[in-house]
Regions:
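Cleavable N-terminal export/targeting peptides
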Residues: 1-24
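Helix-adjacent hinge/juxtasegments
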Residues: 87-111
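Short glycine/proline- and aromatic-enriched beta-strand/turn motifs that initiate or cap beta-hairpins
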Residues: 20-64, 70, 77, 194-204
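Flexible, solvent-exposed loop segments that connect beta-strands
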Residues: 35-42, 71-96, 126-153, 186-190, ...
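Predominantly the C-terminal beta-signal and adjacent terminal strand-loop region
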Residues: 65-79, 147-150, 154-205
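Outer-membrane beta-barrel channels and translocator barrels
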Residues: 23, 57-61, 107-112, 166-170
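Residues on the lipid-exposed face of transmembrane beta-strands in outer-membrane beta-barrel proteins
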Residues: 29-33, 50-56, 68-72, 97-105, ...
């Protein structure tokens, strides 16, 4: 057992040593728009996210690139649905984490890299009664929180394409375009509702 453990540790160390030279930490800032087609809610809201992620080389130009983005948004309940809200008509404030789990393929062109990616996004949200809203609406906050995870509303297949420039040695900067497909809405026949489009400014080292 001890021998197997040592072999496993040695293998992990060897694998990490292979990847460490190209392992990158990525910081991001991203304006995002969430499509809302229901007039009972806010017009498609624009929010801003801040994120951190990693790029781990796999083989050839393939990479594994998990990324976590934090943002917040207001929500309300209308027509028995959870909808984005304007600040004047809000019920809940929900801090949110979008966890991207994509694989990508880096295409090098001298000091320029194009990286298409595809994967899954997991949208983690929890709402709190917004400041200034009556406690009588607490039940609506419970409804909102249940709605976040009902009928796969948390699962977002995603596609992305990044454009990065090598500034010096391992320091890179660029931007990416992302699209998140709301699986919960698709299953209800509302493909566009809750779709997310994001422009991501990236810094990697």
């Amino acid at each position: 057992m001890k021998k197997k453990t040592l072999i496993f540790v040695a293998f992990c160390f060897f694998a990490f040593s292979l990847f460490s030279a190209d392992f990158k930490t990525v910081f991001s800032l991203s304006p995002q728009i969430t499509i809302n087609t229901d007039k009972a809610g806010a017009p498609s809201p624009v929010k801003f996210g801040v994120g951190i992620g990693f790029e781990l080389p796999l083989f050839k130009n393939m990479i594994f690139a998990p990324h976590l983005t934090f943002s917040t948004n207001y929500y309300l309940v209308a027509n028995n649905k959870v909808l984005p809200a304007e600040i004047e008509n809000r019920t809940a404030l929900a801090p949110s984490l979008m966890l991207d789990i994509p694989f990508g393929y880096k295409i090098p062109i001298k000091n320029f890299y194009i990286t298409p990616k595809i994967g899954l996004g997991t949208f983690l949200r929890y709402g709190f009664l917004a400041n200034g809203v009556s406690k009588a609406e607490s039940d609506l906050v419970d409804f909102i929180n249940k709605g976040f995870y009902k009928d796969l509303a948390w699962l977002y297949p995603m596609a992305e394409i990044d454009f990065d420039f090598l500034i010096k040695e391992k320091l890179m900067a660029g931007f990416g375009l992302k699209y998140y497909l709301p699986l919960g809405s698709v299953l209800k026949g509302e493909t566009l509702q809750n779709s997310i489009f994001a422009l991501q400014f990236r810094f990697a080292f």
